[in-house]
Regions:
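Alpha-helical coupling/stalk and coiled-coil linker elements that connect catalytic or binding modules
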Residues: 1-373
Length: 373
Protein backbone atom coordinates (compact mmCIF):
# COMPACT_ATOMS: atom_id res chain seq x y z
CA UNK A 1 0.00 0.00 0.00
CA UNK A 2 2.71 2.49 1.00
CA UNK A 3 4.64 1.64 -2.16
CA UNK A 4 1.57 2.38 -4.30
CA UNK A 5 1.08 5.64 -2.40
CA UNK A 6 4.69 6.61 -3.16
CA UNK A 7 4.14 6.06 -6.87
CA UNK A 8 0.83 7.93 -6.74
CA UNK A 9 2.32 11.02 -5.13
CA UNK A 10 5.21 11.04 -7.63
CA UNK A 11 2.70 10.90 -10.49
CA UNK A 12 0.67 13.70 -8.91
CA UNK A 13 3.81 15.82 -8.72
CA UNK A 14 4.33 15.49 -12.47
CA UNK A 15 0.73 16.18 -13.55
CA UNK A 16 -0.51 18.71 -10.98
CA UNK A 17 0.70 22.14 -9.79
CA UNK A 18 0.73 21.09 -6.14
CA UNK A 19 4.53 21.07 -6.02
CA UNK A 20 6.60 20.10 -3.01
CA UNK A 21 3.76 18.82 -0.74
CA UNK A 22 3.26 15.87 -3.08
CA UNK A 23 6.99 15.11 -3.01
CA UNK A 24 7.03 15.32 0.78
CA UNK A 25 4.10 12.92 0.92
CA UNK A 26 5.91 10.57 -1.50
CA UNK A 27 9.01 10.63 0.71
CA UNK A 28 6.98 9.85 3.84
CA UNK A 29 5.18 7.00 2.08
CA UNK A 30 8.53 5.62 0.90
CA UNK A 31 9.96 5.72 4.44
CA UNK A 32 6.82 3.98 5.73
CA UNK A 33 7.14 1.32 3.01
CA UNK A 34 10.75 0.57 3.93
CA UNK A 35 9.93 0.45 7.65
CA UNK A 36 6.96 -1.87 7.23
CA UNK A 37 8.89 -4.17 4.91
CA UNK A 38 11.84 -4.46 7.31
CA UNK A 39 9.49 -5.09 10.26
CA UNK A 40 7.70 -7.79 8.29
CA UNK A 41 11.01 -9.47 7.43
CA UNK A 42 12.09 -9.47 11.10
CA UNK A 43 8.74 -10.89 12.18
CA UNK A 44 9.03 -13.70 9.62
CA UNK A 45 12.54 -14.50 10.86
CA UNK A 46 11.40 -14.70 14.50
CA UNK A 47 8.46 -16.94 13.59
CA UNK A 48 10.64 -19.28 11.51
CA UNK A 49 13.23 -19.48 14.30
CA UNK A 50 10.57 -20.38 16.89
CA UNK A 51 9.18 -23.12 14.63
CA UNK A 52 12.69 -24.47 13.99
CA UNK A 53 13.49 -24.60 17.73
CA UNK A 54 10.27 -26.51 18.38
CA UNK A 55 11.20 -29.01 15.66
CA UNK A 56 14.68 -29.49 17.17
CA UNK A 57 13.18 -30.30 20.56
CA UNK A 58 10.63 -32.68 19.06
CA UNK A 59 13.33 -34.53 17.13
CA UNK A 60 15.53 -34.90 20.21
CA UNK A 61 12.59 -36.22 22.20
CA UNK A 62 11.93 -38.76 19.45
CA UNK A 63 15.61 -39.70 19.49
CA UNK A 64 15.47 -40.47 23.22
CA UNK A 65 12.50 -42.73 22.46
CA UNK A 66 14.54 -44.61 19.85
CA UNK A 67 13.31 -42.89 16.67
CA UNK A 68 16.13 -41.68 14.41
CA UNK A 69 14.26 -41.28 11.12
CA UNK A 70 14.43 -37.44 11.15
CA UNK A 71 18.23 -37.57 11.09
CA UNK A 72 20.67 -38.25 8.25
CA UNK A 73 21.56 -41.96 8.13
CA UNK A 74 24.75 -41.53 6.06
CA UNK A 75 23.78 -44.28 3.61
CA UNK A 76 25.88 -42.58 0.92
CA UNK A 77 29.03 -43.24 2.97
CA UNK A 78 28.58 -47.03 3.12
CA UNK A 79 31.74 -48.76 1.88
CA UNK A 80 31.72 -52.56 1.82
CA UNK A 81 35.52 -52.59 1.53
CA UNK A 82 36.22 -50.42 4.57
CA UNK A 83 38.14 -52.19 7.37
CA UNK A 84 35.37 -51.75 9.94
CA UNK A 85 32.54 -49.32 9.10
CA UNK A 86 30.55 -51.84 7.04
CA UNK A 87 30.78 -54.67 9.59
CA UNK A 88 29.72 -52.65 12.63
CA UNK A 89 26.99 -50.54 11.00
CA UNK A 90 28.65 -47.15 11.18
CA UNK A 91 26.55 -45.90 8.26
CA UNK A 92 23.02 -46.59 7.09
CA UNK A 93 19.56 -46.67 8.74
CA UNK A 94 19.69 -47.13 12.54
CA UNK A 95 23.49 -46.85 12.33
CA UNK A 96 25.90 -45.05 14.62
CA UNK A 97 26.05 -42.16 12.18
CA UNK A 98 22.24 -42.00 12.12
CA UNK A 99 22.21 -41.64 15.91
CA UNK A 100 24.95 -39.03 16.03
CA UNK A 101 24.36 -36.77 13.03
CA UNK A 102 22.88 -33.33 13.74
CA UNK A 103 24.86 -31.45 11.11
CA UNK A 104 23.40 -28.37 9.47
CA UNK A 105 25.67 -28.45 6.41
CA UNK A 106 26.77 -31.01 3.84
CA UNK A 107 30.38 -30.14 4.64
CA UNK A 108 29.74 -30.97 8.29
CA UNK A 109 28.14 -34.29 7.29
CA UNK A 110 31.21 -35.20 5.22
CA UNK A 111 33.52 -34.24 8.06
CA UNK A 112 31.55 -36.29 10.59
CA UNK A 113 31.72 -39.31 8.27
CA UNK A 114 35.48 -38.84 8.01
CA UNK A 115 35.81 -38.65 11.80
CA UNK A 116 34.04 -42.00 12.14
CA UNK A 117 35.77 -43.79 9.26
CA UNK A 118 39.26 -42.24 9.26
CA UNK A 119 39.90 -40.59 12.65
CA UNK A 120 43.01 -38.48 13.07
CA UNK A 121 44.87 -40.02 15.98
CA UNK A 122 46.96 -36.93 16.61
CA UNK A 123 43.86 -34.86 17.46
CA UNK A 124 41.85 -37.42 19.47
CA UNK A 125 42.39 -35.73 22.84
CA UNK A 126 41.85 -32.20 21.52
CA UNK A 127 38.70 -33.35 19.74
CA UNK A 128 37.38 -34.99 22.91
CA UNK A 129 37.95 -31.76 24.84
CA UNK A 130 36.03 -29.81 22.21
CA UNK A 131 33.15 -32.31 22.28
CA UNK A 132 32.95 -32.14 26.07
CA UNK A 133 32.82 -28.36 26.00
CA UNK A 134 30.10 -28.23 23.35
CA UNK A 135 28.11 -30.91 25.21
CA UNK A 136 27.93 -28.54 28.18
CA UNK A 137 26.18 -25.89 26.04
CA UNK A 138 22.70 -27.34 25.32
CA UNK A 139 21.00 -23.99 24.67
CA UNK A 140 23.68 -22.89 22.23
CA UNK A 141 23.53 -26.25 20.42
CA UNK A 142 19.74 -26.13 20.24
CA UNK A 143 19.78 -22.77 18.47
CA UNK A 144 22.65 -23.93 16.26
CA UNK A 145 20.83 -27.10 15.16
CA UNK A 146 17.72 -25.05 14.42
CA UNK A 147 19.58 -23.57 11.45
CA UNK A 148 19.47 -26.94 9.68
CA UNK A 149 15.88 -27.98 10.34
CA UNK A 150 14.36 -26.96 7.01
CA UNK A 151 17.35 -28.04 4.90
CA UNK A 152 21.09 -28.50 5.15
CA UNK A 153 23.40 -25.88 3.78
CA UNK A 154 24.98 -27.10 0.55
CA UNK A 155 28.55 -26.28 1.53
CA UNK A 156 30.07 -27.09 -1.85
CA UNK A 157 27.32 -25.20 -3.66
CA UNK A 158 27.80 -22.15 -1.45
CA UNK A 159 31.57 -22.29 -1.98
CA UNK A 160 31.11 -22.54 -5.76
CA UNK A 161 28.66 -19.65 -5.76
CA UNK A 162 30.95 -17.45 -3.68
CA UNK A 163 33.91 -18.31 -5.92
CA UNK A 164 31.82 -17.46 -8.98
CA UNK A 165 30.76 -14.17 -7.43
CA UNK A 166 34.36 -13.42 -6.54
CA UNK A 167 35.32 -13.84 -10.21
CA UNK A 168 32.73 -11.36 -11.50
CA UNK A 169 34.69 -8.55 -13.12
CA UNK A 170 34.03 -5.14 -11.60
CA UNK A 171 35.65 -2.02 -12.99
CA UNK A 172 37.98 -0.38 -10.50
CA UNK A 173 36.36 2.95 -11.34
CA UNK A 174 33.53 2.10 -8.98
CA UNK A 175 35.78 2.41 -5.92
CA UNK A 176 37.43 5.68 -6.94
CA UNK A 177 36.68 8.70 -4.72
CA UNK A 178 36.03 10.68 -7.90
CA UNK A 179 33.20 8.30 -8.83
CA UNK A 180 31.53 8.83 -5.46
CA UNK A 181 31.95 12.60 -5.72
CA UNK A 182 30.43 12.73 -9.21
CA UNK A 183 27.53 10.49 -8.17
CA UNK A 184 26.69 12.56 -5.09
CA UNK A 185 26.95 15.77 -7.10
CA UNK A 186 24.58 14.41 -9.74
CA UNK A 187 22.12 13.30 -7.07
CA UNK A 188 22.28 16.69 -5.37
CA UNK A 189 21.68 18.39 -8.72
CA UNK A 190 18.61 16.21 -9.29
CA UNK A 191 17.14 17.12 -5.92
CA UNK A 192 17.96 20.77 -6.62
CA UNK A 193 15.89 20.67 -9.83
CA UNK A 194 12.99 19.20 -7.85
CA UNK A 195 13.16 22.00 -5.28
CA UNK A 196 13.55 24.71 -7.92
CA UNK A 197 10.63 23.34 -9.91
CA UNK A 198 8.53 23.48 -6.75
CA UNK A 199 9.37 27.02 -5.62
CA UNK A 200 10.22 28.81 -8.87
CA UNK A 201 8.89 29.03 -12.41
CA UNK A 202 11.26 26.30 -13.60
CA UNK A 203 9.21 23.71 -15.55
CA UNK A 204 8.76 20.40 -13.72
CA UNK A 205 9.87 18.71 -16.93
CA UNK A 206 13.45 19.72 -16.12
CA UNK A 207 13.36 17.63 -12.95
CA UNK A 208 11.76 14.75 -14.83
CA UNK A 209 14.40 14.80 -17.58
CA UNK A 210 17.28 15.05 -15.09
CA UNK A 211 15.82 12.14 -13.12
CA UNK A 212 15.52 9.99 -16.23
CA UNK A 213 19.10 10.80 -17.20
CA UNK A 214 20.36 9.94 -13.71
CA UNK A 215 18.44 6.66 -13.66
CA UNK A 216 19.72 5.72 -17.12
CA UNK A 217 23.31 6.41 -16.06
CA UNK A 218 23.05 4.28 -12.90
CA UNK A 219 21.40 1.36 -14.67
CA UNK A 220 23.72 1.59 -17.64
CA UNK A 221 26.85 1.48 -15.50
CA UNK A 222 25.78 -1.04 -12.85
CA UNK A 223 22.99 -3.27 -14.12
CA UNK A 224 25.08 -5.64 -16.24
CA UNK A 225 27.62 -6.43 -13.51
CA UNK A 226 24.95 -6.89 -10.84
CA UNK A 227 22.97 -9.20 -13.10
CA UNK A 228 26.11 -11.31 -13.56
CA UNK A 229 26.47 -11.51 -9.77
CA UNK A 230 22.80 -12.52 -9.47
CA UNK A 231 23.31 -15.31 -12.00
CA UNK A 232 26.37 -16.51 -10.06
CA UNK A 233 24.40 -16.90 -6.85
CA UNK A 234 21.37 -18.24 -8.73
CA UNK A 235 19.19 -20.51 -6.62
CA UNK A 236 21.73 -20.54 -3.78
CA UNK A 237 20.75 -17.16 -2.37
CA UNK A 238 18.78 -18.79 0.46
CA UNK A 239 21.64 -21.25 1.07
CA UNK A 240 24.16 -18.44 1.40
CA UNK A 241 21.85 -16.63 3.83
CA UNK A 242 21.57 -19.83 5.92
CA UNK A 243 25.35 -20.27 5.90
CA UNK A 244 25.80 -16.68 7.07
CA UNK A 245 23.49 -17.38 10.04
CA UNK A 246 25.50 -20.49 10.93
CA UNK A 247 28.74 -18.49 10.88
CA UNK A 248 27.19 -15.78 13.06
CA UNK A 249 26.02 -18.40 15.55
CA UNK A 250 29.50 -19.93 15.78
CA UNK A 251 30.96 -16.47 16.31
CA UNK A 252 28.84 -16.14 19.48
CA UNK A 253 30.77 -19.00 21.11
CA UNK A 254 33.27 -18.24 23.86
CA UNK A 255 35.45 -21.37 23.62
CA UNK A 256 37.92 -22.63 26.19
CA UNK A 257 39.29 -25.85 24.66
CA UNK A 258 42.30 -25.56 22.36
CA UNK A 259 40.67 -27.00 19.23
CA UNK A 260 37.55 -24.87 19.55
CA UNK A 261 39.64 -21.76 20.16
CA UNK A 262 41.57 -22.37 16.95
CA UNK A 263 38.47 -23.11 14.86
CA UNK A 264 36.52 -20.26 16.42
CA UNK A 265 39.36 -17.88 15.66
CA UNK A 266 39.24 -18.85 12.00
CA UNK A 267 35.46 -18.54 11.79
CA UNK A 268 35.32 -15.32 13.81
CA UNK A 269 37.61 -13.76 11.25
CA UNK A 270 35.08 -14.70 8.61
CA UNK A 271 32.05 -13.23 10.35
CA UNK A 272 32.32 -9.82 8.72
CA UNK A 273 33.01 -11.35 5.31
CA UNK A 274 30.05 -13.74 5.37
CA UNK A 275 27.74 -11.16 6.93
CA UNK A 276 28.57 -8.74 4.14
CA UNK A 277 28.09 -11.51 1.57
CA UNK A 278 24.66 -12.15 3.07
CA UNK A 279 23.70 -8.47 2.88
CA UNK A 280 24.86 -8.29 -0.73
CA UNK A 281 22.91 -11.42 -1.70
CA UNK A 282 19.75 -10.04 -0.07
CA UNK A 283 20.23 -6.72 -1.85
CA UNK A 284 20.67 -8.53 -5.17
CA UNK A 285 17.48 -10.46 -4.52
CA UNK A 286 15.54 -7.26 -3.79
CA UNK A 287 16.44 -6.00 -7.25
CA UNK A 288 13.74 -8.34 -8.54
CA UNK A 289 11.16 -5.71 -7.54
CA UNK A 290 11.31 -3.57 -10.69
CA UNK A 291 9.34 -0.61 -9.36
CA UNK A 292 11.37 -0.59 -6.16
CA UNK A 293 14.58 -0.82 -8.18
CA UNK A 294 13.60 2.25 -10.22
CA UNK A 295 12.64 4.33 -7.18
CA UNK A 296 15.68 3.43 -5.09
CA UNK A 297 18.05 3.95 -8.02
CA UNK A 298 16.41 7.28 -8.81
CA UNK A 299 16.44 8.75 -5.32
CA UNK A 300 19.26 6.83 -3.59
CA UNK A 301 21.53 5.50 -6.39
CA UNK A 302 21.11 2.09 -4.74
CA UNK A 303 22.69 0.07 -7.57
CA UNK A 304 25.81 2.19 -7.52
CA UNK A 305 26.30 1.81 -3.77
CA UNK A 306 25.53 -1.92 -3.99
CA UNK A 307 28.18 -2.29 -6.68
CA UNK A 308 30.67 -0.43 -4.47
CA UNK A 309 29.93 -2.79 -1.56
CA UNK A 310 30.31 -5.76 -3.88
CA UNK A 311 33.67 -4.52 -5.19
CA UNK A 312 34.99 -3.91 -1.65
CA UNK A 313 33.91 -7.41 -0.59
CA UNK A 314 35.73 -8.93 -3.57
CA UNK A 315 38.87 -7.00 -2.74
CA UNK A 316 38.95 -7.76 1.00
CA UNK A 317 37.58 -11.27 1.47
CA UNK A 318 37.20 -13.35 -1.68
CA UNK A 319 40.47 -15.29 -1.38
CA UNK A 320 39.87 -16.73 2.12
CA UNK A 321 36.54 -18.53 1.62
CA UNK A 322 37.86 -22.13 1.44
CA UNK A 323 39.69 -21.95 4.77
CA UNK A 324 36.60 -20.55 6.48
CA UNK A 325 34.17 -23.13 5.09
CA UNK A 326 36.46 -25.96 6.25
CA UNK A 327 36.51 -24.57 9.79
CA UNK A 328 32.71 -24.32 9.81
CA UNK A 329 32.42 -27.95 8.64
CA UNK A 330 34.74 -29.10 11.44
CA UNK A 331 32.69 -27.33 14.11
CA UNK A 332 29.49 -28.64 12.55
CA UNK A 333 30.70 -32.23 12.98
CA UNK A 334 31.83 -31.58 16.55
CA UNK A 335 28.37 -30.25 17.45
CA UNK A 336 26.86 -33.57 16.35
CA UNK A 337 29.26 -35.55 18.52
CA UNK A 338 28.57 -33.20 21.42
CA UNK A 339 24.82 -33.71 21.10
CA UNK A 340 25.30 -37.48 21.20
CA UNK A 341 27.55 -37.15 24.25
CA UNK A 342 24.92 -35.00 25.97
CA UNK A 343 22.16 -37.52 25.20
CA UNK A 344 24.25 -40.43 26.55
CA UNK A 345 25.80 -39.09 29.79
CA UNK A 346 26.54 -42.66 30.94
CA UNK A 347 29.25 -42.84 28.30
CA UNK A 348 32.75 -41.97 29.51
CA UNK A 349 35.99 -40.99 27.88
CA UNK A 350 38.51 -43.77 27.34
CA UNK A 351 41.82 -43.53 29.15
CA UNK A 352 44.79 -44.39 26.98
CA UNK A 353 47.86 -45.86 28.72
CA UNK A 354 51.50 -45.74 27.69
CA UNK A 355 51.99 -49.51 27.89
CA UNK A 356 53.57 -51.23 24.91
CA UNK A 357 51.41 -54.33 25.17
CA UNK A 358 47.83 -54.81 24.07
CA UNK A 359 45.48 -54.64 27.04
CA UNK A 360 42.08 -53.27 27.93
CA UNK A 361 39.89 -52.99 30.98
CA UNK A 362 36.25 -51.97 31.06
CA UNK A 363 33.51 -51.57 33.65
CA UNK A 364 29.83 -50.84 33.10
CA UNK A 365 30.15 -51.52 29.37
CA UNK A 366 27.31 -50.52 27.09
CA UNK A 367 26.56 -50.81 23.38
CA UNK A 368 25.35 -47.66 21.58
CA UNK A 369 22.56 -49.68 19.94
CA UNK A 370 21.68 -52.07 22.78
CA UNK A 371 22.33 -50.02 25.91
CA UNK A 372 24.02 -51.22 29.10
CA UNK A 373 24.92 -54.93 29.39
Amino acid sequence: MFFAMTLGFVVLYTITPWGWPTLAAAALALVAYVGVRRADERNDERREQAEALREVCQRERACLDGTFAPFDDGQRYVDAHHPYTFDIDVFGPQSLYNRICRTVSTGGSDRLAAMLSAPRLDTVDAQADAVSELASLPDWRKHYCAEGVSAKVDTEGVARALHAVAKVKVGQWVLLPLTLAVALTALAAFFATIVLASVTTMPSGVAVVSGIALLAAVLGLCHGTLMEAMRATGKLQEQITMFVRVVAHIADLKPESAMLKQLHGEVAGATAAFAEAGHIVKALDRRGNILGLILFDLFLLSDLFLLRRFARWQKDFALSMDQWTEAVSEIDALVSMATYAYNTPQGVRAEVTDDDGVSYEGRGLRHPFLGAK
